[in-house]
Amino acid sequence: MSQLMQLKDVAESTRLGPLSGEVSAGEILHLVGPNGAGKSTLLARMAGLTSGEGSIRFGGAPLEAWATATLAQHRAYLAQQQNPPFAMPVWHYLTLHQPDKTRTGQLNEVADMLGLGDKLGRSVNQLSGGEWQRVRLAAVVLQIHPDANPVGQLLLLDEPMNSLDVAQQNALDRVLHHLCQAGIAIVMSSHDLNHTLRHAHKAWLLKRGKLIACGRREEVLTPSYLAQAYGLRFRRLDVEGHPTLISAT
């Protein structure tokens, strides 16, 4: 896998770092750690929305050198929370995020994959929390989907599983896996350690803005490292062939 983004001594006030790491094309990287660990701060910095100490290079160039419009063609970012902007149909909201507005087939395909096919005519301000979250996810997927955007490279997601039920989480995992196979790098924050253990290629474990461990998921999500991050004892068991983490009291 080729390196897509390099972070060196990235820090932001007392909330983050300094930390260094790399993101490769076609990999799924999970940011894990307790509340206040700095996951959202790091994602916003990687998206180019904030500034601070250290340096980030994206696609071989300093992140701050990218023009905003050009950067939006290469990376998409889902914030943790966002209210509907104003009343508009779901299909209209999704179209605003498409680089090629004529590709209605791509819009319908992504909407169907996320269970939104029957909601395209609904107004975004009349959706449930879970429905709105899936609309937001569909929008950022369409923004960098390789079938419609040949320069899409990076998808940054802040707690994308919020408000999704088990079936909807599974549907999102399938979409992300498809993007990963197409070469898109995905960086997302997660509070579900077992989900990370099954679906991430790599993980960064943070606590109070510091990077405790980074690397392959099974090397990072160990009882020893997790105890440092969460102050709890953990055990890793094998359940029907799947490694599973439980907190040990």
Curated annotation (Swiss-Prot):
It is a peripheral membrane protein. ATP binds at residues 33-40. Keywords: ATP-binding, Cell inner membrane, Cell membrane, Membrane, Nucleotide-binding, Translocase, Transport. Signal peptide: none annotated. Its EC number is 7.6.2.8. CDD domains: ABC_Iron-Siderophores_B12_Hemin (cd03214). It comes from the Bacteria. Residues 1-233 form the ABC transporter domain. It is an enzyme of class 7 (translocase). Belongs to the ABC transporter superfamily. Vitamin B12 importer (TC 3.A.1.13.1) family. The complex is composed of two ATP-binding proteins (BtuD), two transmembrane proteins (BtuC) and a solute-binding protein (BtuF). This is Vitamin B12 import ATP-binding protein BtuD. It comes from Salmonella enteritidis PT4 (strain P125109). The lineage of its organism: Bacteria, Pseudomonadati, Pseudomonadota, Gammaproteobacteria, Enterobacterales.
